[in-house]
Amino acid sequence: FKEQGGYEVEGTVRGAEMVGWRYGGPFDDLAAQQEPGGYPPPLVAPGESPGAEWKSSVETHRVIDGGRDSKGNALVVAGEGTGIVHMAPGCGDVDHQVGTQLGLPVIAPLQEDGTFGDGFGPFSGRRAIDPATADLVFEELKKKELLVYVETYPHIYPHCWRTGDELVFRLVDEWFINMDWRDEIK
């Protein structure tokens, strides 16, 4: 980034030394970020799920160790970016798994039609996959003087097996009934 406006190295810190540090997020001013227990509000009472303390997303911003999956593989691996990753438990499978383990509140921003719900300020009502929404995110970050540089970065997304369209992760409450027993009653 030195070419894009300059910087000076003031020191070097190993990632392990950062674990536990608290920080302010770029969109902590949004109502959804300040909702105790997550957004939309959870359907369980405090204490019914591990780590549920009814804290807002803003109150839980901290640097964590990304951990490992069930096979012992690092969840965040070298070669996939900076090595510092924001966990968004309502926006991705791995994020949701790690967030649940750590008791982080879940912010599930998308409605059924793929637009941001109420509580997301200028993003409310906008389609998540619309390039204009990404541009608005960049504009908001610039206003807050939090944007250093923008570049296109390849990112692996799930795709529909039939159409090839990119899919967005949307957290929903669902339940299923196991119907395997029906053959036994005939």
Role assignments for model-derived ranges:
Residues 31-93:
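Catalytic-site beta-strand/loop segments enriched in glycine and acidic/polar residues
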Residues 20, 67-186:
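Residue patterns forming the tRNA-binding/recognition surfaces of aminoacyl-tRNA synthetases
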Residues 1-53, 113-123, 161-186:
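Conserved, charged catalytic cores of large soluble enzymes
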Residues 2-7, 58-59, 103-105, 143-145:
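Structural alpha-beta junctions
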